[in-house]
């Protein structure tokens, strides 16, 4: 059976997501993928420069010292930290941990994830700088 009645389609502008802070923050969080792509491409170019010898590596290091690239990399770091923060806040919602017949709150899980991140960062920096 078919009908000739047209369903009502509510008009929606292309900027509908700008009206609510939740959606604006959601778009910002999802936008952190763009700086991640930048960093991935930069890392791949660094690996190729490392493979191609000292001259190529020196050129890559000069590229990284450009003030514009430093600013872009700082923006990338901020985006990565924002993404990490929101991801760590979502993790406790996926884990249902029960201790003594009570559901564990999100704070210990979030703090544990940040502690692991800090320890891993310190270990990686130590290995990179002193090994």
From Swiss-Prot:
One Pfam entry for this protein is Fumarate_red_C
Gene responsible for this protein: frdC
The protein here is known as: Fumarate reductase subunit C
Record topology, Cytoplasmic segments: 1-21, 91-104
UniProt GO BP: anaerobic electron transport chain; anaerobic respiration; bacterial-type flagellum assembly; fermentation
What is the purpose of this protein? Two distinct, membrane-bound, FAD-containing enzymes are responsible for the catalysis of fumarate and succinate interconversion; fumarate reductase is used in anaerobic growth, and succinate dehydrogenase is used in aerobic growth. Anchors the catalytic components of the fumarate reductase complex to the cell inner membrane, binds quinones. The QFR enzyme complex binds 2 quinones in or near the membrane; 1 near the [3Fe-4S] cluster (QP is proximal to the [3Fe-4S] cluster, on the cytoplasmic side of the membrane) while QD (the distal cluster) is on the other side of the membrane.
* Record note on quaternary structure: Part of an enzyme complex containing four subunits: a flavoprotein (FrdA), an iron-sulfur protein (FrdB), and two hydrophobic anchor proteins (FrdC and FrdD).
Q: Is the keyword Cell inner membrane assigned to this protein? A: yes
| Segments crossing the lipid bilayer | 22-49, 66-90, 105-128
Question: What membrane topology term does the record carry?
Answer: Multi-pass membrane protein
State the similarity comment: Belongs to the FrdC family.
Main location per the UniProt record: membrane
Residues binding a menaquinone, per UniProt: 29-30, 87
Where in the cell does this protein reside? Cell inner membrane
Q: Which GO terms describe its molecular function?
A: succinate dehydrogenase activity
The entry's keywords:
Cell inner membrane, Cell membrane, Membrane, Transmembrane, Transmembrane helix
So which stretches are on the Periplasmic side?
Answer: 50-65, 129-131
A GO CC term assigned to this protein in UniProt: plasma membrane
């Amino acid at each position: 059976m078919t009908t000739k009645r047209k369903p009502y389609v509510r008009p929606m502008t292309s900027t509908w997501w700008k009206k609510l802070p939740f959606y604006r923050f959601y778009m910002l969080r999802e936008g952190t993928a763009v700086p991640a792509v930048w960093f991935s491409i930069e890392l791949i170019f660094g690996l190729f420069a490392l493979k191609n010898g000292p001259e190529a590596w020196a050129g890559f290091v000069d590229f990284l010292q450009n003030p514009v690239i430093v600013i872009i990399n700082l923006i990338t770091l901020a985006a990565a930290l924002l993404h990490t923060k929101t991801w760590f806040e979502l993790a406790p919602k996926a884990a249902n941990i029960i201790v003594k017949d009570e559901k564990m709150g999100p704070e210990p899980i979030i703090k544990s994830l940040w502690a692991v991140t800090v320890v891993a960062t310190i270990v990686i920096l130590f290995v990179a700088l002193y090994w």
